[in-house]
């Protein structure tokens, strides 16, 4: 499982790097490497990337706070793809990408992953959607998976029911007699938002099945009742 997750994370990071806009400079025919692309970015972005690569949670949190401020101010501009790359890296820190010293994992920072996941939903790119799906399906921490589900709902991208399918798959493989209430509620909210955003409502039977399962699971009454409420909304 760890090897599969590592491979998946590596592929996603490669795709993210490609999304940074590797193109041949006019008239030279030479393709820029990833590092050359980053050297063309602002000094601030280069520093932020190095902070993301740091080995301690405090430094990673500092760059996340910086990015959160930029998003709040609406100043990402043409740097959106580079910021997404940094957030994707941090959202998979310790889950899809594991670093060990001996037998001990040294990069398990669930709070960092949760915050990075939250911010990915605010970047609003196709790549951020793909990264959120990967986090939803690969992370072991319920609070991180819950944040990924909520962010996917907020993002609202669901072409060909791709996101709905990922959410339904996540529900199908959970033991709903022992799952987390916050996770389940976030899943319900995500389905609700997809239903509201879809013209004519969400038309995906697996989503209905997922909500029925949650409504019958061992969750708080608030969670089960919310699942029933969303099912009623879908009937209308």
Feature annotation, model-predicted:
Residues 19-24, 29:
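Boundary at the C-terminal end of the N-terminal hydrophobic targeting segment
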Residues 28-38, 53, 57-77, 103-106, ...:
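Structural detector for internal amphipathic alpha-helices that build alpha-solenoid repeat scaffolds
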Residues 9-18:
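Bacterial N-terminal signal peptides
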Residues 31-51, 73-102, 125-137, 158-174, ...:
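Amphipathic alpha-helical scaffolding segments comprising HEAT/armadillo-like alpha-solenoid repeats
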Residues 23, 235-236:
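Short, solvent-exposed mixed-charge patches
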């Amino acid at each position: 499982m760890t090897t599969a997750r590592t491979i998946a994370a590596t592929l996603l990071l490669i795709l993210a790097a490609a999304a940074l806009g590797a193109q041949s400079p006019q008239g030279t025919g030479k393709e820029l490497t990833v590092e050359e692309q980053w050297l063309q970015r602002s000094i601030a972005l280069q520093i932020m990337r190095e902070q993301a690569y740091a080995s301690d949670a405090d430094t990673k949190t500092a760059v996340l706070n910086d990015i959160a401020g930029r998003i709040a101010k609406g100043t990402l501009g043409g740097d959106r793809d580079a910021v997404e790359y940094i957030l994707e890296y941090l959202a998979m820190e310790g889950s899809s990408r594991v670093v060990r010293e001996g037998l001990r994992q040294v990069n398990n920072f669930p709070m960092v992953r949760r915050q990075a996941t939250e911010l990915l939903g605010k970047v609003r790119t196709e790549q951020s959607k793909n990264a959120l799906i990967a986090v939803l399906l690969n992370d072991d921490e319920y609070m991180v998976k819950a944040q990924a589900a909520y962010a996917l709902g907020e993002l609202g991208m669901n072409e060909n029911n791709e996101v709905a399918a990922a959410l339904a798959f996540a529900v199908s493989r959970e033991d709903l007699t022992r799952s987390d209430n916050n996770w389940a509620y976030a899943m319900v909210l995500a389905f609700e938002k997809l239903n509201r955003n879809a013209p004519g409502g969400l038309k995906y039977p697996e989503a209905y099945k997922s909500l029925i399962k949650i409504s019958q699971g061992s969750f708080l009454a608030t969670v089960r009742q919310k699942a029933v409420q969303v099912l009623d909304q879908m009937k209308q």
